[in-house]
């Protein structure tokens, strides 16, 4: 089984896309570009401050405007650790996901 086979499919599709973007700490540029492109593709409003922080907002689904607002917060970078002797290059390689 692969990550894209998991349910709900749409969640794992987006998660997999994120794993393909190298994003070590202090080198979030590729992730910022990915998120800006994602926002444009899905018509999500996005703002970037001088520090590179992103704020994305999406209006409520029609008919759901009276529902509570959902807020999600996340880091764009990843603390990179690997075992001695492994050849993974966190600056360039995607993360290989394993479904166990």
Kindly give the residue locations of the regions a language model identified.
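N-terminal hydrophobic or amphipathic helices/low-complexity stretches enriched
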Residues: 1-21
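Phenylalanine-focused residue identity feature
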Residues: 14-15, 34, 38, 90
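Bulky hydrophobic/aromatic packing residues
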Residues: 12-15, 31, 73
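Residue-identity detector for glutamine
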Residues: 17-20, 50, 73
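Active-site metal-coordination/substrate-binding segment of hydrolases
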Residues: 65-100
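A non-catalytic alpha/beta surface segment that caps or lines the substrate-entry region
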Residues: 24-70
């Amino acid at each position: 089984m692969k990550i894209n086979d998991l349910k709900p499919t749409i969640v794992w599709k987006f998660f997999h896309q994120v794993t393909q973007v190298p994003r070590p700490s202090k080198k979030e540029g590729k992730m910022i570009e990915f998120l800006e492109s994602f926002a444009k593709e899905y018509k999500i409003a996005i703002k970037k401050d001088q520090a590179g922080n992103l704020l994305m907002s999406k209006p409520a689904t029609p008919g759901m405007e009276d529902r509570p607002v959902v807020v999600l917060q996340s880091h764009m970078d990843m603390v990179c650790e690997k075992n001695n002797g492994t050849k993974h290059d966190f600056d360039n390689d995607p993360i290989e996901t394993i479904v166990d």
